[in-house]
Amino acid sequence: MSYPDTPEQAAVIAWKGTRLVVSACAGSGKTTTLRRFAEENPTERMLYVAYNRAIRDEAEQKFPFNVICKTSHQLAWPTVGKHYSQRLVNTLRLTDVARALNSRNWLLARLTLDVLNRFMCSASAKISEELLPNQDDCKGLQPERILLSAQNIWAMMSSRQETFPVTHDTYLKIYQLSKPDLSARYTTVLFDEAQDANPVTSAIILEQPCRVVLVGDTHQQIYRFRGADNALCAPLLKCADRLWLTHSFRFGPEIAEIANRLLSLKGETHKITGKGGSDRVLTMVPRTFGHHVILHRSVCGVIRTALHWSLAGKKVFWVGGMESYKIEDLLDLYWFSIDMTERMLHDRLTREYRDYDEYLQIAEDTGDVEMKQAIFILEQFFPLPDRLTTLREQRVTTESDADVTVCTAHRGKGLEWDRVQLYDDFADILDPEMPDIKRHDEINLMYVATTRARKVLILDPILAELLAQPSAGELFPPSVES
């Protein structure tokens, strides 16, 4: 069933400029709007750049024939990537770097590798001091030595005559440095999910002489910790046209109000309007609720919930598969806690902590959420190996067979469910001592989690407290998203 374009969508579809930034709230039909834009410009040859292969494949089924859908790596492959095909590996190994440096200094190898990875994901034209680790991480190593090592390894990686391994990010970086001109093949580039763009991809897109349309939601930027860059706010777009899609067709007015309360903490003035029909916001799980998804801030929170439901005899569906939640790390912590380190699969804990008492002390001193959740699981679900056996027995691989679905908020981005519950491990965004940039990141994550719900949203205690405030925007000074 098709719906008429909203006035906001119509403005995007009718746009005729050279640079456009579309700020699209969760569930606002941004892909539909881009498809309509392409349909209204049938003589233009457009390129849709997707974040990953799955999004690219889905987009290809939706867009008309005048739109070519590619990931950034697919863009780089024909002219650059194919020349390195015999040297491709998934990740660079420390041993590869150490051999190339002819050194058994493993700290030098690791820091060199860190610099290389930062460079390949950056928009930088060369490996320079800005990519070096801080002085404390160098632990006595001269920064100049790390810099020279990284430059030498990069020279080997980028040369077609060398044999040093390369990753997919290597040839993408080489492609960006070649300053490709896409205007010979395309009149318009459509850049989706631009708020969490890899800086190297942003550099490729923003330097194009053809028309460029960037679409995304600043408030859904949740991968800053991985080095993601909000291309929607790039300096090169200072003079770009800007339009908004504020009508969400995913949820109704009640969930929209929660989203608006959250975003007002960041000083957002564009209000989301819920157009998805009737919805409800609750603070408690009803006694008879049926299947629902529980979204978490932490991986340990997911495991804790899954253990609780599994031990109650309920079937659990893990978004992304149970294996992706690193259950073995928790099992290692269990063996570490009872001083049976010979049964551990990995030695990370023994390398980083003197003993389990030190682990407990550091968790207490730092307030680290993942560490404290892990400690709670070990104490509540003892002995853990037996409980994990039940956990594996109660998992299902088809969501319709489950009593409950578990997922992290990060992994849930791009997904939606009728009934969503927020677990109580999200950060306290109302804490006045929290730094602004961290508060922004945590609000973004909570906003993403909140807007996964279509019909029913069950709040965590933090959001329940926020809802009780007369005006969330008065809690903190307005701030401008950067």
List where the protein language model places each region.
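Active-site regions of enzymes building and remodeling cell-envelope glycoconjugates
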Residues: M46-L47, F63-T71, Y84, C210-V213, ...
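Conserved helicase C-terminal RecA-like lobe
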Residues: D332-D460, A464-L467
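Conserved P-loop NTPase-based nucleic-acid remodeling module centered on helicase motor cores
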Residues: R53-M120, S310-G313, F317-Y325
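Conserved helicase motor core of SF1/SF2 NTP-dependent helicases
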Residues: S23-S28, T32-L34, Y51-D57, H73, ...
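Accessory N-terminal region flanking or inserted into the helicase ATPase core
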Residues: M1-A14, L20-V21, T33, W106-T188, ...
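A short helix->loop->beta-strand "cap" motif at the edges of active sites that frequently abuts
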Residues: T43-E44, P209-R211, A453-K455
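P-loop NTPase Walker
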Residues: M1-R87, N260, T451
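Interdomain motor-coupling "hinge/lid" segment immediately C-terminal to the ATP-binding subdomain
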Residues: G81-Q161, L236, D241-P286, H291, ...
